[in-house]
Amino acid sequence: MKKLAIMAAASMVFAVSSAHAGFTPSGTTGTTKLTVTEECQVRVGDLTVAKTRGQLTDAAPIGPVTVQALGCDARQVALKADTDNFEQGKFFLISDNNRDKLYVNIRPTDNSAWTTDNGVFYKNDVGSWGGIIGIYVDGQQTNTPPGNYTLTLTGGYWAK
């Protein structure tokens, strides 16, 4: 009988204390963010450089772009040009006015083999890779109008 009375009392205490429980905010709020990516992550560096028109001769270097590809064991590292940066088999930097173009060649500086296919520049061999991609003037372009020009390359992998 005592045991039954104790159990009943405990149930009442739990029911009464549960009915009055509540959350009162009294601090800061934290946020957890997660970005889920492909296993093969290809990071493309930024390059900002100034050149005079007279320096835009055929094969003149515009500059190096760093590329770091990790987790690409069974994939071919690739860089894709924005649609505004590729036409008829050629890469180019586009002016801020979206009219003027500065044609360029893209090639690795380590003599590894790469291929261009419809605006995608990809490594012929599979596997992670880190190195420098050189951007070079394609043809004599000393008459290029002054202004700001941009080439946007997105890192990824090539899938046949």
From Swiss-Prot:
Any one Gene Ontology cellular component term annotated for this protein: pilus
Assigned keywords, A-Z: Fimbrium, Signal
Domain of life assignment: Bacteria
Membrane spanning residue stretches: none
Receptor-binding: annotated segments: 22-75
Annotated signal sequence range: 1-21
Subcellular location: Fimbrium
Coiled-coil parts of chain: none
SUPFAM superfamilies assigned: Bacterial adhesins (SSF49401)
Function: Hemagglutinins of uropathogenic E.coli mediate adherence to the upper urinary tract. These adhesins bind to the Dr blood group antigen and also agglutinate human erythrocytes in the presence of D-mannose (mannose-resistant hemagglutination (MRHA)).
Family, similarity comment: Belongs to the Dr-adhesin family.
Stated name of the protein: Dr hemagglutinin structural subunit
Species this protein is from: Escherichia coli
